[in-house]
Regions:
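Retroelement reverse transcriptase polymerase core
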Residues: 1-219
Length: 219
């Protein structure tokens, strides 16, 4: 919570309501904070903006020979909550109640809102040399010289919109790219071998929770 406060992502809240906070263990043993917004989501008018179809995205990458994959740093947290709506995001912790100034994970409209933003700012480049899936951005080109110019345009858009990438999760000007569980190289699309291995080694689900985790992996 201190990190979120220091970053200006949350502030103390006086709202008479709030969502509970849960913690989920990640693969490296650290904990991920999750906020249970189910009650809020039930009364939220759903944003019907369509999430891109994965198959359509792969079709656009097939003829490219150079790729850069960009990962936005804490993507949702780069989107400001509308003024006056902050109390709706209140969560209750052992240290008190806090409300988000940026878009938290767990809101039903968060993916569609973020997708709308990405498609809006990259609209001139979509279907030409950029594909976007939520906070994953792939820049693709047929030649290296062309790729450098495409990257310049993309970075200019990110700078103008004050969006920041996580450099350690990015790959620049590569002859192949791994995107949404697939490896794309020489105009061909292959399943990511790490995904195949994970499916093969997955223990048979013993309950509903484990089944959901498995379905999430293979989807």
């Amino acid at each position: 919570m201190k990190e979120l406060l220091d970053s200006g992502f949350i502030r103390p809240s006086k709202a008479p309501f709030g969502a509970p906070v849960l913690f989920q263990k990640k693969h490296d043993g650290s904990l991920r904070m999750c906020i249970d917004y189910r009650a809020l989501n039930k009364v939220t008018i759903k944003n019907k903006y369509p999430i891109p179809l994965v198959a359509d995205l792969f079709d656009r990458l097939g003829s490219a020979r150079w790729f850069t994959k960009l990962d936005l740093r804490s993507g949702y947290w780069q989107v400001r909550i509308a003024a006056g709506d902050e109390p709706k995001t209140t969560c209750v912790t052992r240290y008190g109640s806090y409300e988000f100034l940026v878009m938290p994970f767990g809101l039903t409209n968060a993916p569609a809102t973020f997708c709308t933003l990405m498609n809006k700012i990259f609209h001139p480049f979509l279907d030409k040399f950029v594909v976007v899936y939520l906070d994953d951005i792939v820049v693709y080109s047929e030649s290296l010289g062309e790729h450098v110019e495409h990257l310049r345009l993309v970075f200019q858009v990110l700078r103008e919109n004050q969006l920041y990438i996580k450099t350690e999760k990015c790959s620049f000007a590569q002859p192949e790219v791994t995107f949404l569980g697939h490896r794309i190289v020489d105009g061909k699309i292959h399943m990511d071998t790490n995904k195949i291995r994970a499916i093969q080694e997955w223990e048979p689900p013993k309950n509903v929770s484990e089944l959901r985790s498995f379905l999430g992996l293979i989807n």
